[in-house]
Each structure stands twice: as structure tokens, then as C-alpha cells.
Design a protein with these regions (language model features):
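Non-catalytic interface/linker regions that flank or bridge core catalytic/transmembrane domains
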Residues: 1-89, 95-97, 101-463
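Alpha-helical phosphate/pyrophosphate-handling elements in metalloenzyme active cores
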Residues: 61-87, 233-248, 255, 464-506, ...
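Active-site-adjacent "gating/activation" loops or surface patches in catalytic cores
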Residues: 87, 94-103, 347-362, 370, ...
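Divalent metal-dependent catalytic cores for phosphoryl transfer on phosphate-bearing substrates
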Residues: 95-121, 248, 262, 466-467, ...
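Hydrophobic alpha-helical scaffolding
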Residues: 115, 166, 181-189, 213, ...
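Conserved catalytic alpha/beta cores of large enzymes that bind or transform nucleotide phosphates
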Residues: 134-138, 147-150, 406-417, 421-424, ...
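Regulatory modules associated with amino-acid/nitrogen control
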Residues: 266-267, 306-360, 430-432, 440, ...
Length: 898
């Protein structure tokens, strides 16, 4: 804290000490007097914050006021002042204190003093601080104990580096500070390595990205801890009291210092507001806090973006800037501390670049001034030379300082467009270098459309990264699919991506697939226009241009078809194949879709979704090879699959006439949706089912491929009231996630229902026979009397799901062909949803004849084909309105109540 700031704090003091001490002397209860003083401090500082006072005065001012309160509390007890000192450590030791931050104290004792002799004073002092609601963290150590613990734990050593005496013998503090900062405790090298390791672990916990949708102001990359790490190392190695001192050592420029200071003050302001508005120590920008903070800082919704998205965009941009500085300065420190004594090994790459002790470096400082294209060339060289460990700090700074050269002329320079395409075609390092280009601010300038999506959040649960971070992850996933370790999890994608004739077209499509977001309108259409223009500017051929633009425009087509449509229907496959046009388009689209889903939110990818995607790909590929002019005839398809199933049944000795008689009672949908093997197994089990009063339940896995498949539960029973409600409610109680429901009603009053389920962890059920038998028996017991089906389990709905709950929408229409009412339900996904919908149907005596279950992100789009008690579509308009209203009301109310 500067002398000027200290003087300003004294002049704007909140608590008048003489008056405060007089009030304490006169009071019967000192605790209430202390509490009132602290409340006065909180209220006054909060008012000043709301009125726009300099955040530094507030953060330092709070620590300064609390110092005075603690000193007075200390003086109420008897201490041997020459043998004890009260030390402020950590953030409080720096003189910084946010509204709800911990107040970390060290009671430092002379080695000749035993803590037991001060037990009453220590206990009374700390109890007083807790009683007056100060959030105090404390430790009591002798000088030697303190030194030994600091040697063993870098966190304790760091806390002592940032420490100051509040009251007591300051010489004790000076002595321990000298010992802890000596080479005997931690050498500069050891300390730097420990802080690097600490930061790496901290970043790993936050997915190594600044762009988490609920970032931590302290611990996420680009957060306050990254700035503090710079300060700790600077203080330990360079003796710098402030980061400003690094300017004198030529480690930081004045411009960089200004950016660092502004970034820190911004994070301080957000953290102060977060503590104040939440009323607790909170450093996570949780979704509900983001909205409150956006409103507090004056952001307003616009047509293009929500207020919360604007607020978070600013946060992300500042975080990425601070993270970039952290990288650069730690690289500087690495060179100054770890590599200072290394032999300087320099290997020229060309006239502009060289490798300096394993790191890329410009050959001379004015390289970018004389050869602006070198700003692009640097990343190509890094990709072409994977043994290079990174970029020298001085070169990172030069790249930053010369970014202004990336202008329209730069973008139109054939050397730069050629270099960028060379990077896209590089066999190694594409993902790493595109990410590095983004980090150093080059990509957003080279592709202005990409620059506009940097830091743009998507305020939902479907996307867990910002648009730019997601885009970089899609490119990374496309790269990873080439590697052998991904062959088992993604066999088709792995094979395809290694056979694509021009892999660079896939990367370009990935780069542009979401680039149109945030502008209003269809982002796929907008992105396709940008992608086509890019391809022209980079001199790609006509076919290549059209392929890339088509991929961007249709990047959602395959996932939407697989998730929302009945891909067992030959008409659906033919329509999709017509849109895709040829196998090469299909191959590119399949890989892009797989990468997109996995880079959007890894929890979205499960074994069932993998199965759907594989089936859509293989069926479409078969249709394309057969020729679009030769679509599959449904009758031919049904006849073929019946022949195959009948062949299997004959081998088992099943009477053909009995089979055909049974099949005559079943509609065509069953034979279009099921495989010959499934039809054979179902038919055999039904014909051999002797306990006709009880439901027949069969459980099988849909695939034995690793990472694919789900568990199918087939139920054959009398078609009676509440069957659907009882089934889904029982499955909910068994913690089964229903992915798909195929409901077929026979002409003889029975139902053939097939439910595709996953376990709670989104994998097929265990093949443990005891577990499967338990599930089977539970279903038989409950469905034997579906009138008395189990209650719906009340499960806790995740906090984020409640925050992003959008109103349920229900659409009803009558299908004249099937003579059924179609009920479409669009609602936020949550545990027990189908069970609740089934209960509503049951109360209205509706029978579910067919259902299509589809989860799209955090929402479901489910279709139910129902009939009334007379097996007819709902004809009463008033009943339709009442049903629509009741579904919306019950689902929305229960989402908030659970």
C-alpha cells in the first residue's frame, strides 16, 4: 500500500477510535459494541462501493479498519509483548480484504515462550473475534515451529512472504520473514517450481480454461490467484514489493502494467459485488449470481445478447488477457530462474526465427516490423517442429506488440493465406497452434468473425463453454479422432477421419460452424456465408468451397435427425440421404457431428447416442450406395425382415403358422423398428409364455460393442389402463434413464413395449444376473396391477437446472391416419419426468399407443400418440385445453418444488 493511499484511508476513516474506545469502556457488553462497529464499516464501505468509489480504497480500507478493531480486541488481554506478535498473513497480510474474505492471523511466539502459558489469553482473544462475527483463521506457532512448517509447505511459506505485524514485537516478524525467505528454506528455483506446480493443479481443477460457464474468480485461469502467483515469485526472486517494480527490471512494460492493474481492479470489483450481493464468501460466478451481477453493473438485454452474456463476455476477455500475461511472465521467470545458468544453445530455423534452448525465438527484435507475415509463420513453424517446447517470453511480447499489423492488407496477403492453409494441412499441431493463435490474439484479428465470438457465452446448460472455446475444442476433437487411442471409442469416426481426402476442410468447417452466433438470425446460414468467403479468400477450389459451406450450414442436421426422428423408418433415411447427397459429404458430416457433440458437453455423449449415430450413418451410407433413385419400399422391408425372423424361428422348431397368426395382430411399425433377431426372440418368448395373466419381461443389451449400445427392456402384457404410467414410474424408481420407448398395441388387446434404458451413469445396465432379475421381477410385480403403480420419487433437481428452466410447451393435434392424438411436450429435462407425464395421462384415462423420446441438451422433445377410454383420439376441445394447461402447470411447478 502506497503512502498516499494510506494517508487517504486515514482521512476517510469510518470508526473514530477515541469514541469507539469510550463506548467500549461504558458498555456492559463489549461484543455488541464491536458488532455495531463492524456493521458500520460494512454498511459504509458498501455505500461507497455503490457510489463508485475507487475499489482500491475499499479493499485496502476494509483491511485498515479491521486492523484497528483487532488491535483494540488484542489489547483487552494480557500479553508479554516482547515475546509475542500478532501477524496478518495471506491476502489480509497484503492489506487486502473483501467483504466476506477470511482474516488469517498468526500468533507468533518467541521460542522460549510456551503456548500453554498464554492459553487463556489466546482462547479469550480468538473467542472474542468469533463472537463479533469475524471470519478468522488462526494458527499459533513458535519461531522454530513456523520455520519448519514453512519449509515443509510452500503454502505456509507463501503466506509468510505476504505478512505484516499488526501488534506486538515486530522483531519476531522480521526474524521469521528473513528465515523463511532465505535460500535455506526455499531456494528461488524450488519456490518457483512449487508455485508452477500449484498453479497447474489449480487450473486442472477448472478444466484448464478461462471459459468455464461458472468460473472461479480466484482459482480459474486468468483469476486473482494467477496475478498473485506473479507477485509471489516476483517478491521471492526479485525482491519486488509491487509488480510495478518489475518495470524497473525490464520484465514488465508500462503498458502491460496498466493492463494488469486494470484487470486486477476489475476482478476486485466483481468479487466485492459478489460478496456483497450474495452475503457470503463466494468466489464462484454461479449462474444465479451472474444475472444479479449483470443487473448490478448496469447491463441490459439487447436483441443480440442477454445482459448476463454481455457481463460474462467482458469477464472472459479480461480473464484471457490476464492468463496470457501470466503465461508470458512465468515464462520470463522460468528463463530467469530455472534456465539462467544453462548453456545458450541457438539453432537457426530461417532468417527470421531460431530455436533458443528449446523455445521459438525471433532472430532479431524487428522481425515483425520488417516481415509482418512472420506473425503467421511463427505458428506454422511450431506445428512443423513439435520438438519446440513453446515460445520465448520476449517473442510472446513482440507478437503482442505487433498484433496491430494484422489488418486488411495482412489478411489479403497471399503469403499469409498460404501460411494459414499450410497450418490447416499440417500433420501435427493444428489444434495446439490454433489455440495458441487465439491466446496471443492473432486468430481473432486474422478472422474478425472469430474475434466477435471470443468470450461469447451461451447462457444454457447445453453448452458448457463459450463459443470460441467450444470451437477450439471441436478442432481438438477432430484431431484426436485420428489417434489410435480413440479408435475403440469412435471406430467409424477414427476410420473416416484417417481416410478423408482433405482433412483441412474438416478443420475449416469446425472453425466456422458456430461463428455466426450472437448476430441474430440462423447462425448456420450466417456461418456458411463466412466460410464460403474464407475459402474464396484462401483460394480453395469450387468443390471444396461448397463442401465447407454445406458442412457449416448443415452441421446440426445429423444430430437432429438421429435424436428427433424415427431413424428405423426407411422414409426418414431416404430424406436424410437426399439431403446429404453422397458418401463423402456423409463422412465429413459424421466426423464433424461427433466432434461437435463431444466438444459441446461431454456428458451429452453416451452409449445410446453413439448407437443412434452409427445406425444413421450406416443406414444412410447403404441408401446412398443403393442409389437415391432406388429407395427402400416399406412393404419389401417388412417382408424381408419377417422372412429373416421366420428363418431363425424355424431353426428353433417354432410352428410357422402360430408365428404368422401372431404377427397378423401386430402393425407394420413393429417390424420396421425391430431387428430380425429381436423379433425372433420376442415371438418365441410370447408363444412360449404360459403365465398369460402376468406380464412377460425380457432384458437384453442392444450391442456388445464397447462404448455403444444400451439395455432394452421388452414388455408384453395386456393393454390395460395405466400401463405406460406404471411402467415409467417403476423404471424411475429403479433409477433407469429411458432413452427411447417403442409402444405397439396388437389387435388382440395386448401391448408390445420396448424401452431402451441406461443406468444413472449413462451406460448400459450391468450384466449381473441378480440385478437384471431384480429389475425384471419388480416390473412384473408392478405391472400385474398397474392401477396401483408406485409413487413418483421426489428427487432433488440440480440448482443449474432450476435456473435455466424455461416454460413447458405442449402441442396437441389429431392424426387422421392413425386415429390418435399426438401430444408434443417440450420441457426442461429432469429426473422422473416421464413418470410425471405418465401420471397426468393416467388421471385423464389416456392410453399411450406410441412414444418417441428425445433429449436435446437440457430439454426434451417427447411425442406421445394417445387415445381416450374409447380407443379414439381426443375430440373434446375443452379437454385438450385442460390437458395442455395441466401438463404445463404440473411440470413447471414440480421443477421448482423438487
Amino acid at each position: 500500500m502506497s503512502t498516499v493511499l494510506h494517508q487517504q484511508l486515514a482521512e476517510s476513516q469510518i470508526i473514530n477510535l477515541p469514541e469507539f474506545e469510550a463506548e467500549l469502556a461504558a458498555a456492559r457488553s463489549s461484543v455488541s459494541v464491536f458488532k455495531r462497529a463492524l456493521q458500520t464499516i460494512d454498511q459504509e464501505l458498501d455505500d461507497r462501493f455503490r457510489n463508485g468509489e475507487d475499489i482500491r480504497k475499499l479493499i485496502y480500507g476494509r483491511a485498515w479498519e479491521i486492523d484497528r478493531i483487532i488491535r483494540i480486541a488484542w489489547q483487552r488481554f494480557d500479553w508479554p509483548d516482547d515475546q509475542v506478535a500478532l501477524i496478518a498473513v495471506g491476502g489480509y497480510g497484503r492489506g487486502e480484504l473483501h467483504p466476506k474474505s477470511d482474516i488469517d492471523l498468526l500468533l507468533l511466539l518467541d521460542n522460549n515462550l510456551q503456548a500453554e502459558s498464554l492459553q487463556d489469553a489466546i482462547g479469550g482473544f480468538l473467542t472474542l473475534l468469533w463472537d463479533i462475527n469475524l471470519d478468522v483463521g488462526s494458527s499459533v506457532r513458535t519461531m522454530d515451529e513456523c520455520y519448519e512448517e514453512a519449509r515443509a509447505d510452500v503454502t505456509i511459506a507463501t503466506n509468510l512472504i505476504e505478512s505484516r505485524t499488526l501488534i506486538g514485537n515486530d522483531q519476531l516478524h522480521e526474524q521469521i520473514y528473513s528465515r523463511v525467505t532465505s535460500e535455506d528454506a526455499w531456494s528461488d528455483r524450488e519456490f518457483f517450481i512449487a508455485k508452477q506446480k500449484e498453479q497447474t493443479g489449480r487450473h486442472r481443477k477448472t478444466n484448464n480454461t478461462e471459459y468455464n460457464l461458472e468460473p472461479n474468480l480466484k482459482n480459474s485461469p486468468g483469476g486473482l490467484r494467477d496475478l498473485q502467483t506473479i507477485g509471489w515469485v516476483a517478491k521471492r526472486h526479485f525482491g519486488a514489493t509491487f509488480i510495478r517494480d518489475l518495470v524497473d527490471d525490464n520484465f514488465v512494460t508500462e503498458n502491460e502494467l496498466d493492463i494488469l492493474n486494470k484487470g486486477e481492479l476489475y476482478l476486485w470489483s466483481v468479487r466485492y459485488a459478489l460478496h456483497m450481493l450474495s452475503g457470503r464468501k463466494e468466489d464462484r460466478l454461479l449462474f444465479d449470481h451472474q444475472r444479479t451481477l449483470a443487473e448490478f453493473f448496469g447491463y441490459k438485454d439487447t436483441q443480440g445478447s442477454l445482459a448476463v452474456e454481455q457481463f460474462m463476455s467482458k469477464y472472459y476477455r479480461i480473464a484471457i488477457t490476464l492468463s496470457e500475461f501470466n503465461d508470458m511472465l512465468l515464462q520470463h521467470f522460468d528463463e530467469a530462474i530455472l534456465r539462467a545458468d544453462e548453456e545458450q544453445v541457438i539453432t537457426p530455423l530461417n532468417s527470421r526465427f531460431q530455436i533458443h534452448n528449446g523455445y521459438l525465438e525471433v532472430a532479431y527484435p524487428s522481425v515483425f516490423e520488417h516481415h509482418p507475415f512472420a506473425l503467421m509463420e511463427a505458428f506454422v513453424l511450431l506445428a512443423q517442429n513439435p520438438h519446440i517446447q513453446g515460445v520465448r517470453a520476449t517473442t510472446i511480447r513482440l507478437i503482442r506488440d505487433n498484433r496491430h499489423r494484422v489488418d486488411e492488407e495482412f489478411r489479403n496477403d497471399i503469403r499469409n493465406t498460404s501460411l494459414f492453409m499450410e497450418l490447416m494441412r499440417s500433420p501435427e499441431g493444428v489444434s495446439t497452434e490454433v489455440r495458441r493463435m487465439t491466446r496471443y490474439g492473432i486468430l481473432g484479428l486474422y478472422l474478425p468473425a472469430f474475434g466477435r465470438i471470443i468470450g461469447q457465452m451461451q447462457h444454457d446448460l447445453f453448452h458448457i463453454y463459450t463459443v470460441d472455446a467450444h470451437t477450439l475444442k471441436v478442432i481438438q476433437k477432430c484431431r484426436q479422432l485420428r489417434h489410435k487411442e480413440f479408435r475403440e471409442a469412435f471406430p467409424i469416426a477414427h476410420r473416416i477421419v484417417n481416410q478423408l481426402p482433405k482433412i483441412e476442410l474438416l478443420y475449416i468447417a469446425a472453425l466456422f460452424h458456430d461463428i455466426g452466433k450472437g448476430r441474430g438470425g440462423d447462425h448456420s446460414e450466417l456461418g456458411a456465408v463466412d466460410a464460403h468467403a474464407f475459402c474464396e479468400e484462401h483460394h480453395l477450389g469450387k468443390w471444396d468451397r461448397h463442401l465447407v459451406a454445406w458442412l457449416v450450414q448443415n452441421h446440426l442436421l445429423m444430430s437432429m435427425t438421429a435424436q428427433r426422428k424415427d431413424i428405423s423408418d426407411p422414409d426418414v433415411i431416404h430424406t436424410f440421404a437426399t439431403q446429404v447427397r453422397d458418401v463423402l459429404h456423409l463422412d465429413y458430416l459424421y466426423v464433424l457431428t461427433i466432434a461437435d457433440i463431444n466438444a459441446t458437453n461431454e456428458s451429452l455423449w453416451n452409449s445410446w447416442r453413439a448407437t443412434l449415430m452409427r445406425k444413421l450413418y450406416t443406414d444412410t451410407k447403404r441408401a446412398l450406395r443403393r442409389g437415391l433413385e432406388n429407395p427402400v419400399n416399406k412393404e419389401d422391408r417388412i417382408e424381408q425382415i419377417q422372412d429373416e425372423a421366420l428363418f431363425l424361428l424355424k431353426r428353433l422348431g417354432i410352428n410357422s403358422e402360430n408365428v404368422k397368426d401372431f404377427w397378423d395382430t401386430i402393425g407394420d411399425d413393429y417390424f420396421l423398428r425391430e431387428t430380425a433377431q429381436s423379433i425372433s426372440e420376442h415371438t418365441q418368448a410370447i408363444l412360449e409364455h404360459t403365465a398369460t395373466d402376468l406380464p412377460l419381461v425380457m432384458i437384453r443389451h442392444t450391442s456388445h460393442r464397447l462404448y455403444e449400445g444400451a439395455t432394452e427392456i421388452f414388455i408384453y402384457s395386456r393393454d390395460i389402463q395405466n400401463l405406460f404410467a406404471a411402467t415409467v414410474s417403476t423404471m424411475d424408481q429403479l433409477h433407469l434413464n429411458i432413452q427411447d420407448a417403442r409402444i405397439i398395441v396388437t389387435d388382440n388387446g395386448h401391448a408390445l413395449n420396448t424401452y431402451t434404458v441406461l443406468s444413472d451413469d449413462n451406460t448400459p445396465l450391468s450384466e449381473n444376473p441378480d440385478q437384471l432379475n431384480e429389475i425384471k421381477q419388480r416390473l412384473i410385480d408392478e405391472l400385474d396391477d398397474p392401477e396401483d403403480y408406485p409413487d413418483i420419487i421426489q428427487r432433488r433437481v440440480p440448482r443449474q437446472m432450476k435456473l435455466f428452466a424455461t416454460p413447458t410447451k405442449v402441442y396437441l393435434s389429431n392424426d387422421p391416419v392413425s386415429q390418435q392424438t399426438v401430444i408434443e411436450v417440450n420441457t426442461p429435462d429432469r429426473p422422473g419426468l416421464l413418470a410425471r407425464i405418465g401420471m397426468i395421462f393416467s388421471t385423464h384415462n389416456l392410453s399411450v399407443r406410441k412414444a418417441r423420446i428425445s433429449s436435446v441438451g437440457e430439454r426434451v422433445e417427447d411425442f406421445f400418440f394417445v387415445t381416450d377410454a374409447d380407443d379414439l383420439p381426443i375430440a373434446d376441445p375443452m379437454l385438450c385445453q385442460a390437458l395442455q394447461r395441466e401438463i404445463c402447470q404440473q411440470l413447471d411447478e414440480h421443477l421448482q418444488d423438487e
